[in-house]
């Protein structure tokens, strides 16, 4: 059944929004895995755990925001299987933050691709929505993760475990 409110909302954009929803849910699932990995008794980095669990919640909320926009435009939400995280053991904070940065770069590229698709289909509502709710937030998160990686690398070396502990205590307790 077609929507009675649908106007200037191309099937390609609708499919790309559904794909982006899936990417956000996958990111949320990955961050949940990361968060609870760092919460384990043999890892015990509470600040790192909290950082990733907050990201899991933010990505789930972003998926819901996209789904709400999809409905408002007369599109249909088509749910896909959410791929499990690429691993269960994340190693050190450095490895986890590198994986998270790669994930965010992938999400950012998908957002940019959707924005370009919206522009190509002359969809100002979609472009405005992405600019106001996603693009700036994503750039800020990429910068924050890059800064965290720089600081983690500074603390790496012969006593990397101490550096990881200090990073967690001095940086993530204040996020």
UniProtKB/Swiss-Prot annotation:
Domain Ferritin-like diiron: 7-156
InterPro entries: Ferritin, Ferritin-like, Ferritin-like_diiron, Ferritin-like_SF, Ferritin_CS, Ferritin_DPS_dom
UniProt key word Metal-binding: yes
PROSITE patterns named in the record: FERRITIN_1, FERRITIN_2, FERRITIN_LIKE
Protein localization: Cytoplasmic vesicle, Autophagosome; Cytoplasm; Autolysosome
Assigned GO CC terms: autolysosome; autophagosome; cytoplasmic vesicle; ferritin complex
Example GO BP: iron ion transport
A Pfam family this chain is assigned to: Ferritin
Keywords attached to this entry: Cytoplasm, Cytoplasmic vesicle, Iron, Iron storage, Lysosome, Metal-binding
Binding site for Fe cation: 54, 57-58, 61, 64
Entry superkingdom: Eukaryota
Coiled-coil stretches: none
Residues annotated as signal peptide: none
Entry keyword Endoplasmic reticulum: no
GO terms, molecular function: ferric iron binding; ferrous iron binding; iron ion binding
Oligomer status and interactors: Oligomer of 24 subunits. There are two types of subunits: L (light) chain and H (heavy) chain. The major chain can be light or heavy, depending on the species and tissue type. The functional molecule forms a roughly spherical shell with a diameter of 12 nm and contains a central cavity into which the insoluble mineral iron core is deposited. Interacts with NCOA4.
UniProt record similarity statement: Belongs to the ferritin family.
PANTHER family: FERRITIN, FERRITIN LIGHT CHAIN
Role: Stores iron in a soluble, non-toxic, readily available form. Important for iron homeostasis. Iron is taken up in the ferrous form and deposited as ferric hydroxides after oxidation. Also plays a role in delivery of iron to cells. Mediates iron uptake in capsule cells of the developing kidney. Delivery to lysosomes by the cargo receptor NCOA4 for autophagic degradation and release or iron.
Annotated protein name in UniProt: Ferritin light chain
Annotated organism of origin: Oryctolagus cuniculus (Rabbit)
């Amino acid at each position: 059944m077609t929507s009675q409110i649908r106007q200037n909302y191309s099937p390609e954009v609708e499919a790309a929004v559904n794909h982006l929803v899936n990417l956000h849910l996958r990111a949320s699932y990955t961050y949940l895995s990361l968060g609870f990995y760092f919460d384990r008794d043999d890892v015990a980095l509470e600040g790192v755990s909290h950082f990733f669990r907050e990201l899991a919640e933010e990505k789930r909320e972003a998926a819901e925001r996209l789904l709400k926009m999809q409905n408002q435009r007369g599109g249909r939400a088509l749910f896909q299987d959410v791929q499990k995280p690429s691993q269960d053991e994340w190693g050190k904070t450095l490895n986890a933050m590198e994986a998270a940065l790669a994930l965010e770069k992938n999400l950012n590229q998908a957002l940019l691709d959707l924005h370009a698709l919206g522009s190509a289909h002359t969809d100002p509502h979609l472009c405005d929505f992405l600019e106001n709710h996603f693009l700036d937030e994503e750039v800020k998160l990429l910068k924050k993760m890059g800064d965290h990686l720089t600081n983690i690398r500074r603390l790496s070396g012969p006593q990397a475990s101490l550096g990881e502990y200090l990073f967690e205590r001095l940086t993530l307790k204040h996020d």
